[in-house]
């Protein structure tokens, strides 16, 4: 059948509405939803015809596509997914998972009125930042603290407050770009601070900073390169040296440590990552970091440091535009409470627990998952293998964590097709594919995920 005839054969919406099965859906759903879904189905087949992808179709085909489309339109777009990639802080999958304490706190303040900006002791308006400021000070040792909606906002607010229309001196090797084309120079531009690059990509000396200080200098800026490493012939100015230089010229020193860990991971066999506490102990005046990376909390930009600088930031007009909501505050409070005891934090904050849990634990978990799959799913090959997980989230570049995975292949379906079907399933499962095998890394899986994985694998060949 030629293309024109196929297009003429496309059913009209009024015609489809008279179909018994469509009419049944009309009784249970709004007319707008049904009509929109029918239109999408017709448009889909029109597109397939114009692309020469089909040479025939039936009204039943259009109705079946309508049913799938209707169910998709009714479901929420923001979905739970199962992360079997082994990337703990997976940026595309929502970064850090919240601790139980944080989730409970969010539910409590979300389903009730709260004292968001009300001082219960004084009986008058209060500050939303008061709910977490004392906690942040306690776990970091800072003089003062405040929170905005993400770390880019924290950097922008701090720079705007410290050196609007003045110069911020930073090493050329620290002008980083993170995901989504976010670049430190661009944030500095929007903060209205004037960028002064010093040194070279691989080597920057203290004299590079000092030689560029003038009457218009507003801040000495240090940016932790948390998502890449430069190795070999390198030189970097330490925080202590920058603090001494800042003191000599009465200039504030600001450090953006990005991933924002409160735990010294070198104690657990990892490469050292600067902690918030260590930066403050070295005398850095203002430190900015993320809430949803190594901290293991919600998306937030946390600013800690000297009270005189934080107080100025609180009064900055940008602060209101960048402020966080009650649910984020509740989640952050619940997360920070775990940090009062580091052991409790590692046990209860999923991000920390996943990163620091032992290889032996994951070997046993991988064996359990393999047994369940083998006992319930036919026509697939399953084996447990050693592999490497990643921290992710632009944190600990180059760090790989020994883990165990379940590798899957089949003579009846390709690894790429398995990946696609799992990703598009009712319970989306995100996996890795390597050398014609699907890889399920148990480091980022929960026990509750195992049954779902088994059920979705059962459907793959149907």
UniProtKB/Swiss-Prot annotation:
Q: What GO molecular function terms would the record report?
A: L-seryl-tRNA(Sec) selenium transferase activity
Q: Name one Pfam family in it.
A: SelA
Q: In which pathway does it act?
A: Aminoacyl-tRNA biosynthesis; selenocysteinyl-tRNA(Sec) biosynthesis; selenocysteinyl-tRNA(Sec) from L-seryl-tRNA(Sec) (bacterial route): step 1/1
Entry keyword Protein biosynthesis: yes
Q: Could you tell me which residues carry N6-(pyridoxal phosphate)lysine?
A: 293
Catalysis performed (reactions): L-seryl-tRNA(Sec) + selenophosphate + H(+) = L-selenocysteinyl-tRNA(Sec) + phosphate
- Per its record, how is this protein called by name? L-seryl-tRNA(Sec) selenium transferase
Q: Which organism is it from?
A: Clostridium botulinum (strain Kyoto / Type A2)
List the lineage, top down: Bacteria, Bacillati, Bacillota, Clostridia, Eubacteriales
């Amino acid at each position: 059948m030629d293309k024109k005839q196929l297009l003429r054969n496309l059913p009209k919406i009024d015609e489809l509405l008279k179909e018994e099965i469509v009419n049944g859906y009309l009784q249970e759903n709004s007319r707008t939803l049904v009509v929109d879904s029918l239109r999408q189905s017709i448009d889909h087949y029109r597109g397939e015809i114009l692309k020469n992808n089909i040479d025939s179709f039936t009204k039943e085909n259009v109705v079946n596509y309508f049913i799938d489309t209707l169910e998709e339109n009714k479901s929420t777009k923001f979905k739970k997914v199962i992360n079997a990639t082994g990337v703990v802080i997976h940026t595309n999958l929502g970064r850090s998972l919240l601790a139980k304490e944080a989730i409970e706190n969010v539910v409590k303040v979300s389903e009730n009125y709260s004292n968001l900006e009300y001082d219960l002791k004084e009986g008058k308006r209060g500050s939303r930042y008061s709910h977490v400021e004392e906690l942040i000070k306690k776990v970091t040792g800072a003089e003062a603290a405040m929170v905005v909606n993400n770390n880019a906002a924290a950097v922008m607010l701090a720079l705007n407050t410290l050196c609007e229309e003045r110069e911020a001196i930073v090493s050329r090797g620290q002008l980083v770009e993170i995901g989504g084309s976010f670049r430190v120079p661009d944030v500095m531009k929007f903060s209205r601070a004037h960028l002064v690059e010093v040194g070279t990509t691989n080597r920057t000396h203290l004299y590079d900073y000092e030689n560029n200080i003038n009457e218009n200098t507003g801040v000495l800026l240090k940016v932790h390169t948390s998502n890449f490493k430069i190795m070999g012939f390198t030189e970097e100015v330490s925080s202590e040296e920058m603090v001494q230089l800042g003191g000599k010229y009465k200039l504030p020193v600001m450090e953006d440590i990005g991933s924002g860990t409160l735990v010294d991971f070198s104690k657990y066999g990892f490469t050292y990552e600067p902690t918030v506490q260590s930066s403050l102990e070295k005398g850095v005046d203002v430190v900015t970091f993320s809430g949803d990376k190594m901290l293991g909390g919600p998306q937030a930009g946390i600013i800690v440091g000297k009270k005189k600088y934080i107080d100025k930031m609180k009064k900055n007009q940008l602060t209101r535009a960048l402020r966080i909501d009650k649910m984020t505050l509740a989640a952050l409070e619940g997360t920070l409470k775990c940090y009062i005891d580091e052991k409790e934090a590692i046990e209860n904050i999923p991000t920390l627990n996943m990163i620091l849990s032992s290889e032996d634990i994951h070997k046993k978990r991988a064996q359990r998952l393999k047994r369940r799959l083998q006992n319930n799913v036919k026509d697939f090959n399953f084996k447990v293998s050693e592999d490497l997980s990643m921290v992710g989230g632009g944190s600990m570049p180059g760090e790989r964590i020994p883990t165990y995975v379940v590798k899957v292949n089949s003579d009846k379906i390709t690894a790429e097709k398995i990946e696609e079907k799992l990703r598009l399933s009712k319970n989306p499962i995100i996996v890795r594919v390597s050398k014609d095998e699907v890889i399920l890394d148990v480091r980022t899986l929960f026990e509750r995920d195992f049954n779902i994985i088994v059920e979705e694998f059962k459907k793959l060949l149907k």
